[in-house]
């Protein structure tokens, strides 16, 4: 990587960090209001409206308000009792808390985030929810701070598109999954016909648009990391030629 591109990647990562830190602080500051925190995203394409009401209503209001995703990966990951699940870019913890319920006391749900403010919010939300089978880790999704072959399921919600090194994300995801483990991700994906420049015209990087991979690029990236059984299924449009999609993949058995 050239010095110029390395600098640009660092700038993008810092922009993303600042955006999510600000979102966490807005939710935390709103928590003291009599009517509860305002959601940081509230439309039909991003945010808490993509979760079923019966799921939202049983979570801390701050976890729901901090939702910035483009789907509900816990609904498609087919989590089972006793499994160990990792959420890449866990934010305020909504998907970690939902996962913790699905895997039960014999399982464990990990959340990984690079933003101190989001981690603090997630820990507070876990305490309010009374969740004892959760753990939040500080770090980047390009260098996951967990041992190899220890996770059953990796989920993520509209975060991989924000990474400046997606091959590293796919390689690290493959590394931490046990043989036979699986991926269940919600992410923004672009039509194959859209160039990188056309994606940038439709939205910025921090808005989960400019950094989106195409369907073909996403599949190729997962295949290069060693994944099989890849499915990329669009669920709803988020911009012209860009979609929220469910991404599933398997790490082959040893």
Predicted regions and their residues:
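Core SAM-dependent methyltransferase catalytic element
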Residues: 225-254
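A short acidic, Gly/Pro-enriched loop at the edge of an enzyme's catalytic core
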Residues: 81, 142-153
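Conserved alpha-helix/loop element of class I SAM-dependent methyltransferases that forms part
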Residues: 35-84, 95-98, 102
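Short alpha-helix
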Residues: 210-225
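Conserved SAM-binding strand-loop segment of SAM-dependent methyltransferases
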Residues: 129-142
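Conserved SAM/SAH-binding beta-strand->alpha-helix loop
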Residues: 115-117
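Short, glycine-/aromatic-enriched active-site segment of Class I SAM-dependent methyltransferases
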Residues: 190-209
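A short glycine-rich, Lys/Arg-flanked "PGG" loop and its adjoining helix->strand segment in the class I
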Residues: 167-182
